[in-house]
Structure formats: structure tokens, C-alpha cells
């Protein structure tokens, strides 16, 4: 993997490196170490040229595609997904819907009740939903999504979360919806 450290130069100069090696050290003795100048003081060991080339190509692809086009595509997918998912009996989508649906990002957290559920029927457990969708070849995230206090406040143990991006299609959303319905019919 690869990451990017971006920050104000004055703060980066004051920050100590978190690991050592390679060209990040200017001089070293038993008594003292002098770190190299920016950006080298944060580059321990041999740079990962393959990963940096891959990152450069990925950024180039994003720029060629256009961030506005990507945002438009994700927005269309999200609206399509919300509309399709709302048609599912017993579906509860977390986040803005209705007239505020345009405020929803390309991440949809949801829970769903079994078919024929009453208002008091519990929702299908998010881990059951996620595991069974996985068996159908559909990837969703389940759990509290590093937001356990929010889940507690909402009164839920966890949710299923579907995310959409540049490479997703409406057909994949249709597959997700059919998968949710199939899992729902098992309970």
C-alpha cells in the first residue's frame, strides 16, 4: 500500500519521523541523530516505486475522468439505489431520504425486516444479512461502522452498509436489491 502525508511545512519540520532507515537520516552517531530535510525525513527505506507509479496513474485516471463526472455518477447511483431499496417491504434506510435525498452520499446504511413482518417484528440481524449477501456474491459492510455511540443513540446494534463508486452500475444495484429480497425471504 501507499499513503500520502500532506501538511503545513512548518508543522512537518517539527514532527519527528515515526520510523528510521534509508535517506531519512542525514547523520547519526551514538549521541545524536540529525534527520534529513523534507520530504526525505519521512521516507524510511527504499521508496515503493511500484505503488507510487500506481498512485500516479490512479490520480491521472481520476483527473481524466473528471471529479464532477464521478460525483454525478455516484449521485445517480445513490438516488437509484435509494428508490429501489425503498420499494422493499420492511426496509429502513438511515440518513436523508424524501425531499432531502440529494444530501445522501454514495453510502447507504440500512436494516430490513422479514417478509410479512408486523411493526413489532425485529429487523434481520445485520450480521445475518451481511453473511447471506456475501454467499450471494454481494459485498456489504456490517456492524457499527466505528460509530458505536451513534448506533446506541439510534437504538440499533448495527446496520448493513452498501457503498457505491465510480465502477458500480445500476445492474449491480439491482443485484443488491434482489439479494436483499432473497435474504429477506429466508426469515
Language-model region placement:
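Pyridoxal 5′-phosphate
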Residues: 1-187
